[in-house]
Amino acid sequence: MELEHESKRPLYIPYSGPILLEFPLLNKGSAFTEEERRNFNLHGLLPEAVETIEEQAERAYRQYLDFKNDADKHIYLRNIQDTNETLFYRLLDAHLNEMMPIIYTPTVGEACEHFSDIYRRARGLFISHPNKAHIDDMLQNATKQNVKVIVVTDGERILGLGDQGIGGMGIPIGKLSLYTSCGGISPAYTLPVVLDVGTNNPQRLNDPLYMGWRHPRITGKEYDEFVDEFIQAVKRRWPNVLLQFEDFAQKNAMPLLNRYRHEICCFNDDIQGTAAVTLGSLIAASRAAGRQLKDQTVTFLGAGSAGCGIAEQIVAQMKSEGLSDEQARARIFMVDRFGLLTDKLPNLLDFQNKLVQKSSSLAKWDVNNDSISLLDVVRNAKPTVLIGVSGQAGLFTEEIIREMHKHCERPIVMPLSNPTSRVEARPEDIINWTDGAALVATGSPFNPVKYKDQEYPIAQCNNAYIFPGIGLGVIASGAKLVTDGMLMAASRTLANCSPLAQEGQGPLLPLIDDIQEVSRKIAKQVAKEAQIQGVATVTSDGALDEAIERNFWKPEYRVYKRTSF
């Protein structure tokens, strides 16, 4: 009752008239009461009827249904977000399963490609390299003063779409919408940021309406110094903020994470979030088959920072189940465009070197040339798990999937590339090629597959199962860093929420409609692990539960009282 009372306290604000109506965090639209209309000089600026938020949401949903394509639905929802954020999140609460693919993947990819064309209103911060001397001033200009979560991108690797320049801003905006709708983090505490370091995309550079810095991307020392200036400015402005790196190119993603993960509370969702949700899904899938993860043999298509990040988390879990480091790594096969990563390949990246296969262990393999293909690996290594993070459509061919099924009664196939147009194989094909035996999880949403009068649910291995709970756990506990142990706690908690693993039937991952409860559970275990690892103050379980609920924002209108400047 005490927490409920806190949420219903009046909010004292100084704004009135048209200024108040233009403030998305405070605007209630037609839901301003008669008293509020009188006190805040709103009479005549609104229609006569005073409505509830439920009535507003019903109207908004009817309007939403009038749009026939997903891109227009995205623009419509973004317009509501930019005019009345409470209504926006109330609408998402009621229709999250339907609207998540609209506000984020896959539709957000198209919005990023056309960012300058569909631009309506500023949101977040655009930190451009030509203004690098004024980063502190730009952070002071943010309309939100008490920022607790920042999602930042430089727009170079947007989903599977590549360099979109400042169009990449659509990703931090969408991601933070999920922090709020899935993890209960108040929109007043979130800030999307794009670092405008130029673009190498000729379509953007030659577009007369492109709104970003029309310049080739800065690189090397110049780039590193600019990012560092931003990080140091953030530390000065909001020293306790959680910073999420999003959609940075492979050449920058891991170095930035390694450089700053012990300096500021930060993580990279493409590397660590993807790894955490994939690991949670694999633990659950293994349990559903009556096995442990250490019993699986895993092949990856895609050996970039995301793929290698997932692989390292799998190694850590296998070791916790009793394997040695060497034994665990021997069960992981990384394939990229040049073939299987082995100790004979030159010019490997640092994070790839620990995941190579020893050539001596492959001596008896039946292969025809020096480049060992994915099909070669499937034939010889006989994987039980196949994970795609290549960003290339159709590479899980019928021949590869059927070959895998020859030696694996219930293969686990996870084509994780986004958006839908880049998926390695479509779920209906995988189900058909394995005669309904495969357990499939994808990166983008897919409808259930019907095969031989049976319906197969397709789990979306969506990072939204993980990062909102991490954010909530960090805020509730006051954690100073995001550790590997905290990420592992998130994975294991997600696995414990799997209907298939717990009940032997149903989907591999929880329903999206249950994601807020999943986020609460993840937040608690992340916070407890932060305390165990010494990056958060130790409190009781009860105090932690209370902190999580206190920080779990709900889209409800507060009563407003007038104050003066």
UniProtKB/Swiss-Prot annotation:
Keywords: Metal-binding, NAD, Oxidoreductase. One of its GO terms (molecular function) is NAD binding. A divalent metal cation binds at residues 246-247, 270. Divalent metal cations. Prefers magnesium or manganese. It catalyses: (S)-malate + NAD(+) = pyruvate + CO2 + NADH; oxaloacetate + H(+) = pyruvate + CO2. Its EC number is 1.1.1.38. Its cofactor is Mg(2+); Mn(2+). It comes from the Bacteria. NAD(+) binds at residues 157, 270, 418. The active site is at residues 104, 175. InterPro entries: Aminoacid_DH-like_N_sf, Malic_enzyme_CS, Malic_N_dom, Malic_N_dom_sf, Malic_NAD-bd, Malic_OxRdtase, NAD(P)-bd_dom_sf, NAD_malic_enz_proteobac. The record marks 270 as: Important for activity. GO terms for cellular component: cytosol. GO terms for biological process: malate metabolic process. Pfam families: malic (PF00390), Malic_M (PF03949). Transmembrane segments: none annotated. NCBIfam families: PRK13529.1. Homotetramer. PANTHER family: MALIC ENZYME-RELATED, NAD-DEPENDENT MALIC ENZYME, MITOCHONDRIAL. Belongs to the malic enzymes family. This is NAD-dependent malic enzyme. It comes from Photorhabdus laumondii subsp. laumondii (strain DSM 15139 / CIP 105565 / TT01) (Photorhabdus luminescens subsp. laumondii).
